[in-house]
């Protein structure tokens, strides 16, 4: 879902969202909330409303915020039970400065890479682990190349349901009964 003409309606995952407005990262701050109820309160509350406003300023009309889960850890080296366990492990993290800095502060070797390269990189030992919501871990079969899963709910992964603002305005004019 972009402000341009290529995409009209869709879901905007949290990682590209800050490309449109860096303030959107605020919804994914590490350990902001540790439960799904808390994540829903953040998405449905003032922070979610602000994120939608910021995207609107960039030509993206938000229709709602879905919940993609929490970002969890997998790795092939050892169980992670404390920050010390992360030392020396090379993790692929989502490409935002916030995630890179978080992992570095925890002592991990944090790198970014295209998600399409992750499975092969894990197989070949280029990286030792990564972080994603469990739905992505499962659907991408990453559990086939990772021995350890750490459920630490460190970052809420919202899914912005959105539409190009120009298209939405046109549809509202065409169908005046539409409302959000």
Spell out what each predicted region is.
Residues 1-38, 46-180:
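N-terminal secretory/targeting leader peptides
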């Amino acid at each position: 879902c972009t402000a341009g003409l290529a995409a009209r309606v869709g879901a905007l995952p949290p990682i590209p969202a800050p490309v449109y407005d860096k303030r959107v990262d605020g919804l994914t701050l590490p350990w902001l909330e540790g439960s799904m109820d808390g994540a829903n309160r953040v998405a449905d509350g003032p922070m979610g409303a602000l994120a939608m406003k910021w995207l609107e300023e960039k030509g993206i009309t938000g229709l709602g915020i879905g919940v993609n889960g929490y970002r969890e850890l997998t790795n092939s080296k050892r169980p992670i039970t404390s920050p010390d366990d992360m030392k020396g492990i090379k993790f692929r993290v989502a490409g935002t400065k916030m995630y890179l800095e978080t992992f570095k502060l925890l002592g991990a070797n944090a790198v970014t890479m295209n998600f399409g390269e992750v499975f092969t990189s894990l197989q070949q030992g280029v990286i030792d682990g990564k972080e994603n919501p469990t739905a992505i871990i499962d659907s991408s079969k990453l559990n086939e190349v990772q021995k350890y899963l750490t459920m630490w709910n460190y970052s809420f992964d919202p899914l912005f349901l959105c539409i190009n603002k120009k298209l939405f305005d046109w549809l509202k004019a065409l169908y005046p009964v539409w409302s959000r």
